[in-house]
């Protein structure tokens, strides 16, 4: 059993449950609503009809509201500083650098990327 977000030729993006090779849609607005309802409750509300894997397009399971990306992971920072003959500044450990990026740039399996 796997949770997914899918679309079909007839319906736009909707949460679903994949059981073996069948896809059962869920009566929720999105995957965040499924999580809020609880996995067990959501799973008990699957559609009676099911679709084959070939009948759906899979998308990013959860569309993030915001998205952060880290400047670099520790080993990269250590190596880069060592190559310059310096130690990693203590501030890097206290205030790791990150930035906000575009949450609309998240795509799912086989999505067409513009």
List the model feature ranges, each with a label.
Residues 14-17:
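Short beta-strand-centered aromatic/proline hotspots
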Residues 2-11, 25-28, 34-114:
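Active-site microenvironments in enzyme catalytic cores
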Residues 21-22:
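Well-ordered beta-strand scaffold positions
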